[in-house]
Design a protein with these regions (language model features):
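Glycine- and acidic-residue-biased ligand/ion/polar-headgroup-sensing regions
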Residues: 14-36
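A structural signal for the main folded, soluble domain(s) of proteins
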Residues: 3-4, 27, 35, 56
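Short acidic-glycine-tyrosine-enriched beta hairpin
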Residues: 32-55
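Short hydrophobic/aromatic patches on the structural cores and recognition surfaces of FHA
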Residues: 26-28, 44, 67
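A short glycine-rich, His/Asp/Glu-containing loop-to-beta-strand
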Residues: 1-18, 70
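Structural motif
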Residues: 8, 20, 27-29, 54, ...
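Double-stranded beta-helix
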Residues: 56-86
């Protein structure tokens, strides 16, 4: 998973899958809507997003952020994405 400089992913959640992330390069901000606020993810940091948890990756730096993402759970496909409209 790559987030280019100055870009962000949509605020989203999944009903059936979890995602395990390892930051391999760059620094990202993880926004967990309404619960834990924003967490800064540095290289080699690990994070788990659980089913039903709103989340958004933001790259506020001048360098790309690269994340190794492992999806696991009952259903791991692109249909299992619910996006929040801002």
């Amino acid at each position: 998973l790559t987030v280019e400089p100055g870009k962000k992913l949509s605020m989203q959640k999944h009903q059936y899958r979890a995602e395990f992330w390892i930051v391999s390069e760059g620094v990202a901000s993880l926004n967990r809507f309404g619960k834990e606020g924003v967490t800064v993810l540095q290289p080699h940091h690990q994070n788990t997003i659980y089913p039903g948890q709103w989340h958004q990756l933001i790259n506020q730096t001048d360098e790309p952020v690269r994340i190794v993402e492992i999806q696991y759970g009952h259903k791991c496909d692109e249909e299992d994405i619910i996006r929040r409209v801002d």
